[in-house]
Amino acid sequence: MTNWINTVSRDHVEAGVRGRFTQANHGKPHMLRKMARGDWIVFYSPKTVYPDGEPLQAFTAIGQVADDEPYRAEMTPDFQPWRRKVDFLDCTQTPIRPLIDQLDFIEDKARWGYKFRFGVFKIDDHDLEVIRSAMTDS
């Protein structure tokens, strides 16, 4: 299994949790195709609302990929984003700042936000456990 972080505004994460899905990179399929059933995905939200919401800088959801392939959804006739089904855990929104020193994927602690510019990226099991334990009771 692989562990992922998906950088998404909180309003979009909330829509995904309600609908049990994720999108990535504005609906493009490339990174979703790299995911497999059972992979963990953590959602980091730099803002409350896309594109001009208030700064949030928190992990806002966590779950596991629950299908085998991306699928298309019709939002409007001109926008049919690719998605993956996700089984979300019950969790608590968790600010990132108290966790920065424990997270190995953040190599430069002074410029901790840089990695999130990639949108979707892999993390190791240690980092997943740091985040998951902060967000859940387990």
Curated annotation (Swiss-Prot):
Pfam families: EVE. Coiled coil: none annotated. It comes from the Bacteria. InterPro entries: EVE_domain, PUA-like_sf, UPF0310. Belongs to the UPF0310 family. NCBIfam families: PRK02268.1-1, PRK02268.1-2. This is UPF0310 protein MAV_1800. It comes from Mycobacterium avium (strain 104).
